[in-house]
Amino acid sequence: MTDIKTSLPRIAAIGIAVSALGLAGCDDTGADPKLQIGANPLLPPLHQYLLPPIRIATPVEWGSQTPKVTQGLQVHALAAGLQHPRSVYVLPNGDVLVVESNGPKAPVFRPKDLITGVVQLFAGAKAKDANRITLLRDTNGDGIPDQRTVFLDHLNSPFGIALVGHDLYVANTDAIMRYPYQDGQTSITAKGTKLTDLPGGPIDHHWTKSLLASPDGSKLYVGVGSNCNVGENGLQAEYERAAIWEVDRATGAHRVFASGVRNPTGLQWEPTTGKLWAIANERDEIGPDLVPDYLTSVQDGGFYGWPYSYYGQHLDPRVQPQRPDLVARAIVPDYALSSHVAPLGFAMSSGHGFPASYESGAFVGEHGSWDRTPLNGYKVVFVPFKDGKPSGPAQDVVTGFLDTNNHTHGRPVGLAVDRTGALLIADDVGNTVWRVSSATTAPKPAS
């Protein structure tokens, strides 16, 4: 990533230019986000904009600071000086894989595309793409890696990882690749084989491809985001996108497992019921409180509304012609996270290593908003579960990424739980992986 010290003046100048264009002149003041968290979120009337209002958090360095954690927890940097870390994955032997990645260059078809690029640059999201996976190894169990190696490189905007037996799968933006892996291996030099193509460029609006193996290892599940906000690039560009794929691991054949999910950036199995759950980024540009991003169970064959509707049968008038047949069966998501928080990280609690209040539930990394006031997200929350379903309000677990001056030291992305039960957080603006653990428990691998 370009060094923050040298890039901030250039980024600030761009931000001033954006403001001068009057792009932030619309009323974007939102309601209390707490009103949009849970099973029955506030869904106010929508507002349409010629150009979206822009509210951007200015990136600054962490320096000697760290994120803030709730009582009973502690946090330290597992690894710093990374290059735009987007996701983390823990191997069976405890090694941690860090995906350092960014999206491919996007084409500009309309003024809004240019604005999007400016927003991403100003927010620190347009870093140089390392296209690699770095391995971190802690040999003495003190929670601090003493080995750091390039595990796999020359990838194409990778995001998701899944290990099944001795096959390591990497979801590049345009394909799932398979690599041979042996326990304890610190690098892979073998050329990978393609399992299946994935929807990629030239637009590739949502480039991240989340990845999860089925419990029996026979299938892979892939989150494939839409190619636009809400159909403006033509629905022909959305073929098999805004969907969760099921891929046969033996043949590479795939089917759409669920559709109408605008951007499913994280997939997990709920441990007590065995059901598939996902986090999703919903649409923009119809107001500061629309549409809430969400956490939901995923039904085989289910349709979740995008682009025609949201939260069941709430129509989006920007999409014409409508599909009343699809809208009629659109599923209401289980749990709203509030609007524009941009959930990009998802991990189910392991049931050990954290205080008892975190024994059952989901951790969600909220990357943060760019189009509402006040800013929303920029934290990691915990949604408690009971009997396999959300059972209460989301709780702040890790904050401090955003300060009171709307400066962002970092932005949480991918999450993982290590063998000790500690929570790992990829921070793609601070270029750090943070490790959050119990303040009273020394690192000890789970049996």
What are these regions (language model features)?
Residues G22-G25:
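C-terminal motif of bacterial Sec signal peptides marking the signal peptidase cleavage site
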Residues D28-V69, P107-F109, V118-A123, K128-A130, ...:
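Beta-propeller domain segments
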Residues L78-G81, V150-L155, L195-I203, V256-G260, ...:
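Surface loop/turn motifs at the tips and blade-to-blade linkers of beta-strand repeat domains
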Residues V88, I161, L211, P264-L267, ...:
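Hydrophobic core register within WD40 beta-propeller blades
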Residues L91-N93, L163-G165, A213-G217, P271-T273, ...:
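Residue-level detector of Asp-centered blade-edge/turn motifs that repeat once per structural unit
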Residues D95-L97, D167-V170, K219-G223, K275-I279, ...:
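Conserved beta-propeller blade signature
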Residues I144-D167, N172-S214:
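Asp-box/WD-like beta-propeller blade repeats and closely related beta-sheet repeat scaffolds
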Residues A416-P445:
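Blade-level signature of beta-propeller repeat domains, shared across WD40, Kelch, NHL, RCC1
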